[in-house]
UniProtKB/Swiss-Prot annotation:
GO terms for cellular component: apical plasma membrane; cell surface; dendritic spine; glutamatergic synapse; neuronal cell body; neuronal dense core vesicle; parallel fiber to Purkinje cell synapse; plasma membrane. Residues 456-465 have a biased composition (Polar residues). High levels in pituitary and vas deferens. Lower extent in spinal cord, bladder, brain, adrenal, testis, sensory epithelia from the inner ear. It is found in: Cell membrane. This is P2X purinoceptor 2. Residues 53-326 are extracellular. It comes from Rattus norvegicus (Rat). ATP-gated nonselective transmembrane cation channel permeable to potassium, sodium and calcium. Activation by extracellular ATP induces a variety of cellular responses, such as excitatory postsynaptic responses in sensory neurons, neuromuscular junctions (NMJ) formation, hearing, perception of taste and peristalsis. In the inner ear, regulates sound transduction and auditory neurotransmission, outer hair cell electromotility, inner ear gap junctions, and K(+) recycling. Mediates synaptic transmission between neurons and from neurons to smooth muscle. The lineage of its organism: Eukaryota, Metazoa, Chordata, Craniata, Vertebrata. The gene is P2rx2. Residues 393-472 are annotated as: Disordered. Gene3D superfamilies: atp-gated p2x4 ion channel, atp-gated p2x4 ion channel domain. Its main location: membrane. Keywords: ATP-binding, Cell membrane, Disulfide bond, Glycoprotein, Ion channel, Ion transport, Ligand-gated ion channel, Membrane, Nucleotide-binding, Receptor, Transmembrane, Transmembrane helix, Transport.
Length: 472
């Protein structure tokens, strides 16, 4: 059983299949066929070639450089703040932080003091609760082994060797966000597509003082990349006061989608804004960082002011895609479109053979099996030999009145005017209708009908046309 199955699979593996054209006159099936072809054609023409521009060679991710510069002045309750104090880092890049609120721990010096109660397992009741030399990575210093009173209240915490007093959440609080919406941010951006050797920037080549009198407007000044901080936060869909209090990350996305088949003036940057940090996740929302300012008292004691800053971080993100006509993707997509049109024929074949195949009529018309004869004949092809009159009827169909062939060496001598046997008889002239009758008669022989024995030729044309080719 297994051997027979394997033999059948091996034999089927070497079969060759070729399409067979059948015309099915069915309007519903023809309508489905044309509609599928139309939908496929519309998909490739409208979406693939017009929307996706698949006839172009493309490049994504341009090489980009970004420079940022912030300007503006603000003030807290008792202090004026300028750019050098509230912008980090000061040199400007693709990431810039604008401080909007600070918590200040002043006059810290190296010494010993109570650990902050916000540190896990820092509270104690006696020295036994504090292990000398223990270091808590979430704390502010190394424990001395003593349990000391806290800065305020009746609680006690373990003493640490650190910058004292430690930050405990009761530091001075300064809000800088009152004037922050009017801060301006200049974003200089230039891009380069190396494949197409195309470069462009987001600042118009105009007078040198052009940037001193403009702010960004998509309609009137698209090449003046100076943005108000309040405008950026508003476009990101956020409340400025809330964002300035807790901090957050805003993304400025610059999109350079350029069709290089058009003029350079058609390649323009598109700006969009959105918040990047998770707003509704308390564990990870907001943005803050710490830094310190160091100084000496009396020239000997090193002192610092610790600042925990909350602010709005601006991340400038550049992406884009450039495309230009190329022959290779055009040919590939055209070939794909023409090949995909054949899906309609496949679908209609499935409908025809699955739902409309009554009495397996279409299956018999659709599929044929042709076997090559194991012992091919060396004679002429049947059709050609039949036309030329060179094929004899099968032996079983000879007339009973016809004498059998004489044995070898005993046959009569063929004299002048003697008739040739049928197998070697010269062809006689015939018309097209006679040829048709011969084809029908031959088909009748294969259906079991007795064919008539052809009569001898009335004229001997052997000498002039031995094979009767002139009569075709």
């Amino acid at each position: 059983m297994v051997r027979r199955l394997a033999r059948g699979c091996w034999s089927a593996f070497w079969d060759y299949e070729t399409p067979k054209v059948i015309v099915v006159r069915n309007r519903r099936l023809g309508f489905v066929h044309r509609m599928v072809q139309l939908l496929i054609l519309l998909y490739f023409v409208w979406y693939v070639f017009i929307v996706q521009k698949s006839y172009q060679d493309s490049e994504t991710g341009p090489e980009s450089s970004i420079i940022t510069k912030v300007k503006g002045i603000t003030m807290s309750e008792d202090k004026v703040w300028d750019v050098e104090e509230y912008v980090k880092p000061p040199e400007g890049g693709s990431v810039v932080s604008i401080i909007t609120r600070i918590e200040v721990t002043p006059s810290q010096t190296l010494g010993t003091c109570p650990e902050s109660m916000r540190v896990h397992s820092s509270t104690c009741h006696s020295d036994d609760d504090c292990i000398a030399g223990q270091l808590d990575m979430q704390g502010n210093g190394i424990r001395t082994g003593h349990c000391v009173p806290y800065y305020h209240g009746d609680s006690k915490t373990c003493e640490v060797s650190a910058w004292c007093p430690v930050e405990d959440g009761t530091s001075d609080n300064h809000f800088l966000g009152k004037m922050a919406p009017n801060f301006t941010i200049l974003i200089k951006n230039s891009i380069h597509y190396p494949k197409f050797k195309f470069s462009k920037g987001n600042i118009a080549s105009q007078k040198s003082d052009y940037l001193k009198h403009c702010t960004f407007d998509q309609d009137s000044d698209p090449y003046c990349p100076i943005f108000r901080l309040g405008f950026i936060v508003e476009k990101a869909g956020e409340n400025f006061t809330e964002l300035a209090h807790k901090g957050g990350v805003i993304g400025v996305i610059i999109n350079w989608n350029c069709d290089l088949d058009l003029s350079e003036s058609e390649c323009n940057p598109k700006y969009s804004f959105r918040r990047l940090d998770p707003k509704y996740d308390p564990a990870s929302s907001g943005y803050n960082f710490r830094f310190a300012k160091y100084y000496k008292i009396n020239g000997t004691t090193t002192t610092r002011t610790l600042i925990k800053a909350y602010g709005i971080r601006i991340d400038v993100i550049v992406h884009g895609q450039a495309g230009k006509f190329s022959l290779i993707p055009t040919i590939i997509n055209l070939a794909t479109a023409l090949t995909s049109i054949g899906v309609g024929s496949f679908l209609c074949d499935w409908i025809l053979l699955t739902f409309m195949n009554k009495n397996k009529l279409y299956s018999h018309k659709k599929f044929d099996k042709v076997r090559t004869p194991k012992h091919p004949s060396s004679r002429w092809p049947v059709t050609l030999a039949l036309v030329l009159g060179q094929i004899p009827p099968p032996p079983s169909h000879y007339s009973q009145d016809q004498p059998p062939s004489p044995p070898s060496g005993e046959g009569p001598t063929l004299g002048e005017g003697a008739e040739l046997p049928l197998a070697v008889q010269s062809p006689r002239p015939c018309s097209i209708s006679a040829l048709t009758e011969q084809v029908v008669d031959t088909l009748g022989q294969h259906m079991g009908q007795r064919p008539p024995v052809p009569e001898p030729s009335q004229q001997d044309s052997t000498s002039t046309d031995p094979k009767g080719l002139a009569q075709l």
